[in-house]
């Protein structure tokens, strides 16, 4: 029942996908004292089950993705129990399922490379997130706070989707408080 409601609220009359947030739109309409009035959602029954030793890590923003992963990583203090080669140049550098030729330094905090090919011809600074980059020999220099996502389009083409590390990924494009690549768009 709840999933069907979520699907209806996320889809427009013509089937287009609407911006409907699971936490701020859906979640706040649940419970005995909801902060959002929506009669249909308010009528749902909700149960909260506490988990023994449960913890919550928020992955809603670029910064939270890194800070939450650092918090999980730092649950293990015995370095012998961590499976990696050498010592990380900074605890907030994360590389997974990737090939890279980058020599990281302590001046490279908040780096995330996932499902990507990042050769030594790339220069990273800090607060850079790189995802989906195919094998390449490009010479690229990312300024602080610039992130890159690459998605396949068809069989042989790629779409580059740059964004800012602190971009909220929401907001009216005419509003000066809405940012893209760390700058106001309105």
Model-found features: residue ranges?
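Left-handed beta-helix
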Residues: 1-186
């Amino acid at each position: 029942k709840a999933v069907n409601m979520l699907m209806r609220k996320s889809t427009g009359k013509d089937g287009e996908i609407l911006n409907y947030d699971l936490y701020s739109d859906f979640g706040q309409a649940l419970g005995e004292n909801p902060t959002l009035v929506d009669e249909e959602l308010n009528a749902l029954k909700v149960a909260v089950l506490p988990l023994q030793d449960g913890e919550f890590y928020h992955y809603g923003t670029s910064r939270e993705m890194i800070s939450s992963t650092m918090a999980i990583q730092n649950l293990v203090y015995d370095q012998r129990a961590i499976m990696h080669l050498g010592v990380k140049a900074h605890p907030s550098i994360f590389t997974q399922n990737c090939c890279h030729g980058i020599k990281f330094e302590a001046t490279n905090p908040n780096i995330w490379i996932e499902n990507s090919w990042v050769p030594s011809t790339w220069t990273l600074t800090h607060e850079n997130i790189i995802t989906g980059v195919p094998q390449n020999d490009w010479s690229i220099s990312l300024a602080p706070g610039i992130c890159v996502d690459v998605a396949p389009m068809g069989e042989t083409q790629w779409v580059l989707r740059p964004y800012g590390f602190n971009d909220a990924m929401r907001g009216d494009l005419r509003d000066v408080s809405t940012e893209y690549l760390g700058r106001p768009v309105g």
